[in-house]
From Swiss-Prot:
Protein name (record): Elongation factor P
Protein's pathway: Protein biosynthesis; polypeptide chain elongation
Organism: Hahella chejuensis (strain KCTC 2396)
Gene designation per UniProt: efp
A biological process from GO: peptide biosynthetic process
Keyword set includes Cytoplasm: yes
InterPro entries from the UniProt entry: Elong-fact-P_C, NA-bd_OB-fold, Rib_uL2_dom2, Transl_elong_fac_P/YeiP, Transl_elong_KOW-like, Transl_elong_P/YeiP_cen, Transl_elong_P/YeiP_CS, Transl_elongation_fac_P
SUPFAM superfamilies with a match to the protein in the record: Nucleic acid-binding proteins, Translation proteins SH3-like domain
Residues carrying N6-(3,6-diaminohexanoyl)-5-hydroxylysine: K34
Record GO terms (molecular function): translation elongation factor activity
HAMAP family from the UniProt entry: EF_P (MF_00141)
């Protein structure tokens, strides 16, 4: 894999640190008044999910991680693994364990496309799209006189996630949810 110099560091770059693939979250170039310039890097270990910080002298180089982000369609779960299939027509399937899927489980819907990060052919992480459309399976009927301003109520979705929705939303309706914040965005027109 390619080597990256400190002047090529940017957020999102995948590098190898201590034998583990890591993703750079923040990169700050520091040039003190006296001494050599350096880069202060905040990174996330893609295997463990831990966040760390390290400094690199200006001009150092680091090996790039052999990590691939692929769009894959979620097929099903067998209780232990979550199965995904490549969307390029090859029908190649990968099984991701619970640690790779993480919090994405509450947004997993069959036949939807997710970004799966592979390292040496094994799934490291699964990222949902920014917005998903899910059906409400359970929510209380909203009574208009309950609040002085626009209120909200909890609603359980088909995936098991609970989202705060406005009072006018009813059971059985499809809604659009922001997966980054877990908030209701809008009603989906059918």
């Amino acid at each position: 894999m390619a080597n990256y110099s400190t002047n090529e560091f940017k957020s999102g770059l995948k590098i190898m640190l201590d034998g583990d693939p890591c993703s750079i979250i923040e990169n700050e170039f520091v040039k003190p008044g006296k001494g050599q310039a350096f880069n202060r890097v905040k990174f996330r270990n893609l295997k463990s999910g831990r966040v760390g910080e390290r400094t690199f002298k200006s001009g150092d180089s680091v090996e790039g991680a052999d990590v691939v982000d692929l769009d894959m369609e979620y097929l099903y779960t067998d209780g232990e693994f979550y199965h995904f299939m490549l969307t390029d027509g090859s029908f190649e399937q990968h099984a991701a364990d619970v640690s790779a899927v993480g919090d994405t489980t509450k947004w997993l819907k069959e036949q939807d496309v997710y970004t799966v990060t592979l390292y040496n052919g094994a799934p490291l992480s699964v990222s949902p799209p920014n917005f998903v459309e899910l059906e409400i399976v359970e929510t209380d009927p909203g009574v208009r006189g309950d609040t002085a301003q626009g209120g909200s109520k909890p609603a359980k979705l088909t995936t098991g996630a609970v989202v705060a929705v406005p009072l006018f939303i009813n059971q059985g309706e499809m809604i659009k949810v922001d997966t980054r914040s877990g908030e209701y965005v809008s009603r989906v027109k059918s």
